[in-house]
Structure formats: C-alpha cells, structure tokens
C-alpha cells in the first residue's frame, strides 16, 4: 500500500512538471538595432504584447551605428536586425550570410525623416543649400555606411562635386551630430528628432530633407541564412508581429486631416507612451521630439526592392562592394510584402 501511495506521488509530481498540452516556452529572438526613434514600431510591438502573442521572447540589442549590427548577425550575437544597408552589409550578404527580408523606415517626399544639418559657422559662411555642399566637410559614421551612400546620392541630385567633399568618419551617430553642433564639421545627416531640437536651439541649421531630395529605403529588416534554415517559422511569426506594430505606428503618426496636417489624438499619445520606454525616457520634451521626428513606414513594412537594388548598384559603382552576386539572391520576399 505504501509503495502504491509512493508511486502515485511520484507520478503526480511528474505530471505537474509537464506543460499543459499546447503550451510551450516562447522562442527567444535577439533583435539588433539603434536606440533611436527610427525603430518605433518594434518598441510598440513589444510593449503591446504582439511578440508575446506570437510566441516570441524578443530581446533588444542596441548599437551605435549600422555596420556593427550586420557584424553581430554574422557572429551569431543577434538573430534579426533592422538597420540601414551599408557597403559592409552588402559584402556580407553577397557571401550568402545575410538576407534582406522586409522594409523599415522609408525616406518619403512630404515626410521629414532625416535632415541635412549644417553648423552655424558653415551656414554663416554661405552653406545655405544642398547644392553648395561641395568643398565642405561632412560627417559620416564609417566609409561604406548609409551616410556615405547618401552623400553620393545628394551629389548626383544637387550637382555638386562629390570628390570635393571631405568625409569625416566619426564612428557613431551621436558623434556626427556633436561634430556639427560644435562646429568641428560643416554638415551631416541627422534624423528629425535630433536635428529639429538643435535647429530650434540655434545650434545648427537644417538646409533640406532627404525624403524631398532622394526618397529611399532608409532601413530594412534582415536576418541570416542560418536563422531562416533553422527557424523559418519563427521568422514568419516575428514578421507578423512586426507588421502589427507598423499598423499601429501608421495609425498613430501618419494619418493626415483634410488639410494634410498630422492627426494627433489619444491614439498618438498611447504610442508615445510605448516609445518613451526606450527613447527620450524622462525627457520633458519627449512628446514634442517624437511628433517632430516620426518618419514614414510603408503599409505592412513593405520592402522597396527596386531601391535596395539601386543602393547595391551605387555601392558597387564606388567599389565599396566587391562581389558580383545576383541582387535577387540577397533578398528573400517570403516574409514581408514588397512595395
């Protein structure tokens, strides 16, 4: 009798340790990105439980510039990343390691996402429009970065001599902005939430907006071929949750009234509360900065495939990407819609 009781006790204990049918531990996903306003839909998706609903435990890993995010994916320090596409990224993608799988922030005409920011000294000396950038110093993070790419696009658009621009690689985005506000460098590119406060404080000048001059796919979602091969279903679930975040972001920040002005209401304020968990935390001007800096995301975070291919072509033309892989082999459209 005692043996039967003992056996029943053991069986009951083991049964209690077994998860209820259908329940399972959440799949861990490490997402690499910059700690800026740009990845706001991911902040919202996490705060609103969309990743949890998809059976995912998403951890954010923050970086100071774009190229290290791609490197972190290669070294298996992150599973998925959202970043600007750089020469370094494309060089890794051409080796079959990385795949672009979805869209992110898109520079779009009429939406002020990234500004051309000029120091007071340079502005006072005559650098008052984009076509006058030739002969001036320009801060970027690294050679082959998205900023390096963009100065080339601006030169082609505005007609100044790219070779006359003195590029200063300062490694990190905050250093770029600081270099201009302190007058150490004449100009740079800064997202609106960084550029507007400096201009309002009289510490720098905005002479143009990237979206109005050269609309392009500013950031994109990517993962590794290894992640796709081993966890394709996880990537699909991640993208589904991300799309929910993008839908909420568009509803909060991209609606326009009959006059074309942004609609700001309780939906917007709820989104701001989610975002300030990660950026502008405790900043009394957080609401103002977020409203002034919210950029454009396509519906469902659709990827601008044609522009990604154009970025690759431009990097190759400047010998910043060495391979000759088919551009279509770098992009996997199974996970997100295309523009």
Question: For the regions a protein language model found, what residue spans apply to each?
Answer:
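Long, low-complexity C-terminal extensions of enzymes
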Residues: 320-339
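Periplasmic-binding protein-like
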Residues: 106-115, 200-227, 231, 239, ...
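C-terminal segment of classical bacterial N-terminal signal peptides
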Residues: 18-24
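Short, hydrophobic alpha-helical packing/hinge segments within bilobed ligand-binding/sensory domains
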Residues: 68-70, 87-88, 175-179, 194-195, ...
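Short helix-loop capping/hinge motifs at secondary-structure junctions, enriched
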Residues: 121-129, 226-235
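N-terminal secretory signal peptides and thylakoid transit peptides that target proteins
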Residues: 1-17
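Short, glycine-/small- and polar/acidic-enriched structural segments
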Residues: 25-160, 166-170, 186-192, 207-209, ...
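Secondary-structure end/capping motifs
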Residues: 229-320
């Amino acid at each position: 009798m005692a043996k039967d009781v003992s056996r029943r006790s053991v069986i009951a204990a083991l049964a209690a340790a077994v998860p209820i049918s259908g329940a399972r531990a959440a799949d861990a996903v490490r997402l690499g990105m910059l700690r800026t306003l740009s990845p706001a839909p991911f902040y919202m998706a996490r705060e609103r439980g969309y990743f949890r609903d998809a059976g995912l435990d998403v951890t954010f890993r923050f970086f100071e510039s774009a190229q290290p995010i791609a490197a972190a994916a290669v070294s298996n320090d992150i599973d998925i990343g959202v970043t600007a596409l750089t020469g370094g990224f494309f060089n890794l993608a051409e080796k079959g390691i990385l795949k672009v799988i979805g869209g992110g922030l898109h520079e779009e005409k009429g939406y002020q996402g990234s500004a051309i920011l000029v120091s007071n000294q340079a502005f006072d000396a005559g650098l008052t429009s984009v076509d006058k950038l030739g002969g001036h110093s320009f801060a970027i993070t690294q050679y082959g970065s998205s900023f390096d790419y963009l100065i080339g696009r601006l030169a082609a658009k505005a007609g100044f001599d790219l070779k006359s621009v003195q590029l200063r690689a300062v490694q990190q985005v905050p250093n770029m902005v600081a270099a201009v506000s302190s007058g150490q460098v004449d100009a740079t590119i800064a997202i609106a939430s960084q550029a507007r406060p400096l201009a309002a404080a009289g510490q720098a000048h905005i002479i143009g907006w990237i979206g109005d001059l050269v609309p392009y796919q500013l950031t994109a979602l990517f993962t590794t071929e290894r992640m796709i091969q081993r966890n394709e279903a996880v990537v699909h679930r991640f993208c589904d949750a991300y799309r929910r975040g993008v839908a909420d972001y568009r509803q909060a920040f991209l609606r326009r009234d009959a006059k074309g002005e942004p609609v700001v209401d309780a939906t917007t304020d709820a989104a701001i509360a989610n975002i300030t968990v990660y950026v502008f935390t405790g900043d009394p001007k957080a609401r103002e900065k977020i409203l002034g800096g919210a950029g454009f995301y396509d519906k469902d975070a659709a990827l601008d495939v044609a522009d990604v291919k154009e970025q690759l072509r431009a990097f190759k033309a400047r010998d910043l990407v060495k391979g000759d892989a088919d551009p279509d082999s770098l992009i996997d459209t199974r996970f997100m819609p295309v523009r």
